[in-house]
């Protein structure tokens, strides 16, 4: 049960964070997925020096947030330690919410992000065409920083979002044996656009598959990615950390 996993991680929060700090993790971004989480996510960040927050509505929850007011998202996004907008985007794989509702909220998040110049954290699954169409249309109204998180899309989609100026974050999926297409694309992402993440509590990388994913497991994904790209772990850690602070510019190193 996902809820049980998240509660377990929250209950063990300090131990989980300490394990990550022990392998060199310097900062954490706790991403919200629905409005009911915002206060807790932001509150945790405000109490913990190296933890930051985002506010947003995951596309799975678009239907239950059909009445979300722009002013509410804007006010929450102005909170202390809030450094990003999201997770938002489109998910046509599960289709848990009406697609038009997903599109509406995606655009609303972008609008707030553009005003505050905070990066949009984008989830996209089986929705490449509509995601690109919205990104191109919204970029035409004025630039905004953005990140495709937990990238699993096609190389063509990846190149198009790079051409739009977005960054791409790679999760533990890249370590999976059947992720050959992702591995090939991950080799080609420019150094100044690449980030690494866990998507905790999901998608634990090899050698932790089947376990609850923790922030510290980013070390395993980064190690694999560095080897894949023919780079040293120190080099990859240095430039992906630099990219994080450049994109999430409200965070302080």
What are these regions (language model features)?
Residues 1-253:
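Mid-domain alpha/beta scaffold segments of enzyme catalytic cores
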């Amino acid at each position: 049960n996902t809820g049980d996993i998240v509660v377990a991680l929250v209950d063990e929060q300090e131990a989980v964070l300490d394990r990550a700090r022990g392998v060199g993790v310097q900062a954490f971004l706790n991403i919200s997925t629905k409005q009911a989480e915002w206060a807790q996510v932001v509150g945790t960040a405000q109490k913990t020096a190296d933890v930051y927050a985002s506010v947003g509505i995951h596309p799975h929850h678009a239907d239950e947030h059909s009445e979300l007011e722009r002013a509410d998202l804007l006010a929450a996004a102005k909170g202390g330690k809030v450094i990003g907008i999201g997770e938002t985007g489109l998910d046509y794989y599960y289709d848990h919410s009406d697609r038009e509702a997903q599109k509406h909220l995606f655009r609303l998040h972008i609008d707030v992000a553009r005003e505050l110049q905070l990066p949009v954290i984008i989830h996209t699954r089986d929705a490449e065409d509509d995601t690109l169409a919205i990104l191109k249309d919204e970029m035409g109204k004025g630039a905004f920083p953005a990140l495709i998180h937990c990238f699993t899309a096609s190389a063509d989609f990846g190149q198009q979002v790079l051409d739009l100026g977005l960054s791409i974050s790679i999760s533990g999926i890249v370590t999976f044996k059947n992720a050959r297409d992702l591995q090939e694309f991950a080799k080609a992402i420019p150094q100044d656009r690449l980030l690494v993440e866990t998507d905790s509590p999901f998608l634990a990388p090899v050698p932790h598959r089947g376990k609850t994913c923790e922030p510290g497991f980013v070390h395993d994904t980064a190690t694999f990615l560095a080897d894949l790209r023919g780079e040293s772990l120190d080099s990859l850690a240095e430039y992906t950390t630099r990219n994080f602070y450049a994109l999430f510019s409200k965070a302080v190193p």
